[in-house]
Amino acid sequence: MKILENVNLSEILWYKIGGTARYVLQVENAQDLEKAIDFIKKEKLKRAFFLGYGSNLIFTDGSFDGAVIQFIAPEKSSVSLIRDNTVEAFAGESLDSVIKFAFDNSLVGLEWAGGLPGTVGAAIRGNVGAFGGEIQDVVKEVVIAEITNSKIVLKTLRRFELKFGYRTSLIKKRRNLVVVSVQFRLTPTDAKGIQSARQAYLNNTEYRKRRHPLEFPNCGSVFKNISDPEEVKKILETYPDLEEKIKRDWHGKVSMGYLIKRLELAGFRVGNAQISPKHCNFIVNLGGATQKDVLTIIRTIQGKFREAFDFTPEVEVEIVQ
């Protein structure tokens, strides 16, 4: 475990937003995690927050008087093949490293995630998805740490026990649970299948480069796409022309990026945070943006939705105060 003191979180988090944390504890394995919990207990810290890259977080601008436990990739990769079609990885490994390892071992099933930032642990916690795929589709089991009264107990949960939902899971709902490692059940294929999967991965990665504002720090999709049938109905009452697009292109949901643009909010700016004209469900950091700037934009979008559709869209990002 590596201990860092008085860390400017804007220098280590994906979004480049955040105040100063009293400690950052970097962990590379389950043993490091146990040491981190012991450290928190020894120092009598009252706050702790677990993260990977922080690619889906908006952290407070103020000081964080506690410990940020950051899962990082081990110096020696933990990604391994434990059975013919099962790949295991520590929570701090990048999701991309697992995809590439799978390809090298003639396994497919994760290519839809090409170009997604973030760690394995964060992917499980938020049940990440794209292009019709979700991480829950390929999870076999997860080793989690249950932390209670500064004690840590490791447990193995099977896929159905994780209670996956749209961009959520049991781990996200219960703040004392942390992903330690994951087993993915993937699909064996031949050389032609791998070639096809690699091409899908490249296509998805290129799509992100073209359509997402990767030239600026961002936290990915700020809002969940609209999936609730009643909310979809309200949108169709206002925009009946979207019915075919919802069925054909959006997998039954309604794209938040499209709706924000249609509400004429593209390019809306507060301080150094801006709704990206490139993809309106992204709020980019133009340089020196604050959490306050971003939250003001989020509330503006939610206000416009209440006026137009009589409901408030749900944020996908996690906001840490």
Give names to the regions the model predicted.
Residues 1-131, 138, 147-148:
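Anion-binding (especially nucleotide phosphate/pyrophosphate-binding) glycine-rich loop
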Residues 123-130, 137-142, 156-170:
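Active-site glycine-rich loop that binds ribose-phosphate moieties when present
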Residues 4-5, 11, 57, 153-293, ...:
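Phosphate/pyrophosphate- and phosphate-bearing ligand-binding catalytic cores of soluble enzymes
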Residues 36-40, 197-202, 297-301:
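Short amphipathic alpha-helices in soluble, non-transmembrane regions
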Residues 82-83, 146-150, 188, 227:
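Short acidic-glycine loop/turn motifs at beta-strand connectors
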Residues 77-82, 144, 223, 317:
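A structural signal for short hydrophobic beta-strand segments in well-ordered beta-sheet cores
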Residues 305:
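Conserved ATP-binding N-box helix of the HATPase_c
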